[in-house]
A protein has these predicted regions:
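Post-transcriptional modification and biogenesis factors for structured RNAs
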Residues: 1-175
């Protein structure tokens, strides 16, 4: 076995990326404070051809040098928009036909491994602040909550790690 060189990875160009079909998934970042987490979400979203990222509240917007350290240019390939209020973002997405799930530990949440999706539908996931999580009002406007099963002593994962796990799972279910 031999590690591949970067030139052997057959990656598409940024121009080609803009034209290819995207996964019918929007990521909503609700008050994410860490530029590194935001950049990491951009990079993961690029890897799985996510349709768009909504940056809400205090979530910073590109371009930013600290964000670029983890995004590595994905902040220029993945479509994004800033929406001041995450509730407005959720309501707008629902009006556009998206099914919106907040990723939160909540009463009645669906475990990610039990979530069933319809490949003919469009979805959005809301990721919450690193300390407070998704705002309750945003949860109230969502179609439901999904949760990653955890078996250790901690009750949460880093938001960029959580986003990566959820995107990967939804990608497998929708692709």
């Amino acid at each position: 076995m031999r590690k591949l060189k970067i030139t052997e990875l057959n990656r598409i160009s940024a121009e080609e990326f803009k034209q290819v079909e995207k996964l019918p998934l929007v990521v909503v970042l609700d008050d994410i404070r860490s530029l590194h987490n935001i950049g990491s979400v951009f990079r993961t979203s690029d890897a799985f051809r996510i349709e768009c990222i909504y940056l809400c509240g205090i979530t910073a917007t590109p371009p930013h040098p600290e964000m670029h350290k983890t995004a590595l240019g994905a902040e220029f390939t993945v479509d994004w928009k800033y929406v001041n209020n995450a509730v407005d973002a959720v309501d707008n997405l629902k009006n556009e036909g998206y099914i919106v799930y907040s990723v939160a530990q909540a009463e009645g949440s669906i475990m990610l491994d039990e979530l069933q999706l319809d490949k003919t539908k469009k979805y959005a996931i809301v990721m919450g602040n690193e300390v407070k999580g998704v705002q309750q009002e945003v949860i109230n406007h969502s179609d439901g909550c999904i949760e990653i099963p955890q078996y250790g002593t901690k009750h949460s994962l880093n938001v960029s790690v959580t986003t990566g796990i959820v995107i990967w799972d939804l990608f497998k279910k929708l692709h």
